[in-house]
């Protein structure tokens, strides 16, 4: 069941990010109808007539353009990193007097590797479990996020549908690749 929930989170995240970026830049990418797009033309024929372009360059990309890392965008008193750890870990133990916000330890069933990983907050141990942007921020930048407002980019960077707690090594290997990496 947990694996199903993680996969649904990934799929929902991809859909949400696609909609946000697509709707935000859609008007800039609108194509004027050509003479060969008649009422009787099929969707396939219309799509076949469109020019396919590659992604934009990373020119100007900086992580800071997506706002403060792990902001409390939902204003629940808990930063996004701890929100995701609370959602994705089991057997969670919290730091005292943090209103069940700051995760001290827990268990992760990694959706990427299938491994079970013990999480313990600490300077040398927290990297075992990292939070992955399923659609990496630099990838989103190249696919239209550079046209979003600062507020929308911060929301995108902290969108729980685009975030998963994962094994640190798997996250490092994926790096800023796209969701298919």
Place the predicted regions along the sequence by residue.
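Domain-level detector of nuclease and nuclease-like folds
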Residues: 112-181
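Generic hydrophobic, helix-prone segments enriched in Leu/Val/Ile
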Residues: 44-47, 81, 85, 156
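N-terminal module-boundary/linker segments of secreted carbohydrate-active enzymes
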Residues: 22, 27-78
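Short amphipathic alpha-helical segments with coiled-coil-like heptad repeat character
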Residues: 1-4, 83-87, 175
């Amino acid at each position: 069941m947990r694996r199903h929930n993680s996969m649904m989170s990934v799929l929902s995240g991809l859909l949400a990010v696609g909609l946000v970026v697509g709707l935000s830049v859609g008007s800039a990418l609108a194509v004027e109808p050509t003479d060969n797009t008649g009422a009787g033309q099929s969707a396939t024929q219309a799509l076949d007539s469109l020019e396919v372009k590659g992604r934009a360059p990373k020119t100007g990309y900086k992580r800071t353009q997506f706002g403060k890392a792990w902001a409390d965008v939902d204003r629940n008193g808990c930063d996004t990193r701890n929100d995701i750890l609370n959602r994705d870990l089991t057997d969670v133990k919290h730091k005292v007097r943090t209103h069940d916000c700051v995760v001290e330890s827990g268990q992760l069933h990694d959706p990427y590797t299938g491994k079970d990983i013990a999480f313990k907050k600490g300077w040398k141990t927290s990297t075992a479990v990292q939070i992955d942007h399923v659609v990496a921020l630099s990838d989103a930048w190249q696919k239209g996020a550079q046209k979003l407002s600062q507020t929308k980019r911060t929301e995108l960077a902290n969108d729980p549908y685009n975030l998963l707690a994962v094994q640190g090594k798997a996250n490092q290997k994926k790096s800023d690749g796209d969701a298919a990496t």
